[in-house]
């Protein structure tokens, strides 16, 4: 919006390091009508008018990008992508979301269409300010009140990187990239797989050049050209010369229009055909069209990677068959509980830290699954207990946590740490508390995912995979009713291999990974022991957690419903692929806990033979990144494996990225991150070839 004359521009330069977020400084000023107006302290510009901000958003960005008509004319399963420069208060998102919901009610063919709203913000509005700013809007427009509530519930912590918020019931995906706009735009990969994603409409809503000239650079307009195609539109409040020249230089045809109810002018633009003709022909294979949109896919492997991949594909309208030679969660993913807690890194590295990005998305997704579980009257997927890290084994000091939002990680007083943990006799001066961390129930997760109407599960041992021009043919075997092996052939549009360390056996293009055996231990504490054991999950040189048995636990791990349990994890045996239960590894788990918390030596039962345990095989690459993407020289065969010990934290975001790549959409991971995850990355294959040559010698 144009800068009010009374609002002076702040020219103070930020000294915040790159990739460390500096939240917006909100100043409240009173306009001529007596309304409180939120103003950016950084740029001296109003976010929007409290009197008619929503109407202006509809007029400038929705109407002048022809969104009512363009969205109504989407074909089934088509995805429309909007990119907004300047998320601000989320007003444009809310206006677009409101329109999208209205259109879906009156246009049944939009039931399977999707809206992808990508936005960037360098100085995001803190949660408390955002709630205050949007409250009057919700009061005046009850239809928006529900959307505001959903946005605030999902609003991410203010750390750099992409935060994906899925509003699944509305087929709306919101990607909020926090950080410099140039970095965020550069992170969008327009060359993934065989499809070229593109932006359909641009909302240029950054503060006016008179306040924020640094935003409107040649690089911004160059990225717009790279990410657009013929017919891509743009709209902005500003008619400043720097914006007009920037758009024209990149092939946009511009036009001035009047702002609703005002003498002020605004700008619209359309990418010309000639500009698109300058691009290589190969880059013009746009998003998946109805003719080549995959109808079905097969996922091989029913562990956490396979289940989450199936979920992401099914949510995009693809019929998914999950195949596994064993029952779901029979491998390393089937422990009684999985600890979901952030693996902390210095905050200036978080922008490209897969575990941090994945942890935040996983938490949001699992909380959505909790809602579905409540409807199905099944156990919660995520029990948000909070987790206390005793900082026994860490590469980060508490001083490096100070810039993290308290909702993600914070240090607490020793007294409070003792109170929430129940460890009254333990010195907890050094600690890190993660309030949104907790325990994932794998069996409950499987139940919710396999209940999706687009997902089916079948037990089948895959013997052969053959790719043709138009499909992939799978041959497998299974026991028939007479206990004989019967052969079965399945044809699919796409296949995703999620078979952990056995992935290499299914396709040699998937590098052979490191195998690490891990055994988790648990026991049933007495009532007296329960009063003395930790009351929430703890991280030390291992980890431990109390939990209560739920329905489904008996089937997978022989744990009775409503029975208290205490688990300890986990052993780490390199190169061992046997999954027999071993007393010596139960002892190792016991010893790690007692070494770090000797106060519990008199509490834990020391007869290890009475403990229960489960062993699984983790799969890990030499560079610790999973294998996610399309296999070399293939158009239909994908890898989603090698999650290591972090599957429940990183599989959801990796599955989203894979599904987006398959369908030619922008992913929530940067181009650099996708390159590091590629199953074809050169560094990984060079290491593998070197080790193979050494073995032969």
From Swiss-Prot:
Its EC number is 2.1.1.61, 1.5.-.-. It is found in: Cytoplasm. One of its GO terms (biological process) is tRNA wobble base modification. Gene3D superfamilies: D-Amino Acid Oxidase, subunit A, domain 2, FAD/NAD(P)-binding domain, Vaccinia Virus protein VP39. Its cofactor is FAD. One of its GO terms (cellular component) is cytoplasm. One of its GO terms (molecular function) is flavin adenine dinucleotide binding. Residues 1-272 are annotated as: tRNA (mnm(5)s(2)U34)-methyltransferase. Catalyzes the last two steps in the biosynthesis of 5-methylaminomethyl-2-thiouridine (mnm(5)s(2)U) at the wobble position (U34) in tRNA. Catalyzes the FAD-dependent demodification of cmnm(5)s(2)U34 to nm(5)s(2)U34, followed by the transfer of a methyl group from S-adenosyl-L-methionine to nm(5)s(2)U34, to form mnm(5)s(2)U34. In the N-terminal section; belongs to the methyltransferase superfamily. tRNA (mnm(5)s(2)U34)-methyltransferase family. This is tRNA 5-methylaminomethyl-2-thiouridine biosynthesis bifunctional protein MnmC. The lineage of its organism: Bacteria, Pseudomonadati, Pseudomonadota, Gammaproteobacteria, Moraxellales. The gene is mnmC.
């Amino acid at each position: 919006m144009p800068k009010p004359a009374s609002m002076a521009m702040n020219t103070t330069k930020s000294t915040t390091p790159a990739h460390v977020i500096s939240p917006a400084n909100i100043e409240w000023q009173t306009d001529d009508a007596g309304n409180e107006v939120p103003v950016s302290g950084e740029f001296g510009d109003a976010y929007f008018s409290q009197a008619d901000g929503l109407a202006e958003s509809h007029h400038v960005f929705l109407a002048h990008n022809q969104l009512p008509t363009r969205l109504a004319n989407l074909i089934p399963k088509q995805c429309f992508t909007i990119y907004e420069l300047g998320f601000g208060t989320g007003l444009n998102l809310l206006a677009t979301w409101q329109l999208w919901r209205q259109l879906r009610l009156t246009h049944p063919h939009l039931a399977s269409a999707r809206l992808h709203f990508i936005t960037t913000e360098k100085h995001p509005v803190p949660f408390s300010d955002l709630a205050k700013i949007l409250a009057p809007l919700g009061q005046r427009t009850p239809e928006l009140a529900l959307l505001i509530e959903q946005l605030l519930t999902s609003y991410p912590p203010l750390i750099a990187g992409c935060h994906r918020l899925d509003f699944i019931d509305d087929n709306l995906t919101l990607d909020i990239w926090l950080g410099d706009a140039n970095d965020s735009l550069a992170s969008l990969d327009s060359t993934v797989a065989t499809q070229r994603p593109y932006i359909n409409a641009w909302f240029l809503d950054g503060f006016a050049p008179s306040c924020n000239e640094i935003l409107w650079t040649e690089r911004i307009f160059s990225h717009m050209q790279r990410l657009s195609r013929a017919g891509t539109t743009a709209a902005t409040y500003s008619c400043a010369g720097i914006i007009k020249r920037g758009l024209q230089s990149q092939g946009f045809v511009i036009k001035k229009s009047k702002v609703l109810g005002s003498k002020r002018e605004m700008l619209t633009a359309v990418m010309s055909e000639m500009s698109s003709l300058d691009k290589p022909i190969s880059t013009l294979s746009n998003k998946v069209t109805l003719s080549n949109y995959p109808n079905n896919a097969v996922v091989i492997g029913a562990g956490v990677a396979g289940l989450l991949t199936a979920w992401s594909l099914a949510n995009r309208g693809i019929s998914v068959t999950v195949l596994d030679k064993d029952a779901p969660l029979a491998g390393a993913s089937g422990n009684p509980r999985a600890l979901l807690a952030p693996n902390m890194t210095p905050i200036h590295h978080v922008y490209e830290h897969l575990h941090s990005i994945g942890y935040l998305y996983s938490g949001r997704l699992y909380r959505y699954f909790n809602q579905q579980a409540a409807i199905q009257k099944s156990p919660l997927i995520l029990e948000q207990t909070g987790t206390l890290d005793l900082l026994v084994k860490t590469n980060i000091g508490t001083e490096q946590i100070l810039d993290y939002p308290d909702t993600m990680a914070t240090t607490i007083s020793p007294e409070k740490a003792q109170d929430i943990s129940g460890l009254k006799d333990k010195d907890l001066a050094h600690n890190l508390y993660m309030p949104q961390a907790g325990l994932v129930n794998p069996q409950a997760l499987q139940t919710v995912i396999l209940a999706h109407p687009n997902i089916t599960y079948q037990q089948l041992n895959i013997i052969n995979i053959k790719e043709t021009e138009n499909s992939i043919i799978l041959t497998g075997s299974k026991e028939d009713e007479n206990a004989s092996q019967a052969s079965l052939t399945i044809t699919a549009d796409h296949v995703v291999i999620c078979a952990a360390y056995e992935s290499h056996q299914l396709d040699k293009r998937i590098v052979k990974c490191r195998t690490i055996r891990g055994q988790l231990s648990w026991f049933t504490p007495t009532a007296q022991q329960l009063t003395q054991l930790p009351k929430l999950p703890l991280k030390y040189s291992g980890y431990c957690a109390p939990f209560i048995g739920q329905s489904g636990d008996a089937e997978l791990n022989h744990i009775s419903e409503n029975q208290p349990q205490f688990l300890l994890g986990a052993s780490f045996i390199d190169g061992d692929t046997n999954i027999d239960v071993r007393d010596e590894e139960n002892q190792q788990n016991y010893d790690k806990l007692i070494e770090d918390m000797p106060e519990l030596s008199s509490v834990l039962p020391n007869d290890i033979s009475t403990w229960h345990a489960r062993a699984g095989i983790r799969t890990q690459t030499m560079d610790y990144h999973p294998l996610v993407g399309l296999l070399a020289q293939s158009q239909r065969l994908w890898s989603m494996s090698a999650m290591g010990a972090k599957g429940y934290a990183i599989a959801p975001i990796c599955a989203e990225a894979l599904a987006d790549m398959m369908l030619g959409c922008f992913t929530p991971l940067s181009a650099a991150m996708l390159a590091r995850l590629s199953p074809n990355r050169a560094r990984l294959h060079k290491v593998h070839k070197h080790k193979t040559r050494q073995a032969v010698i």
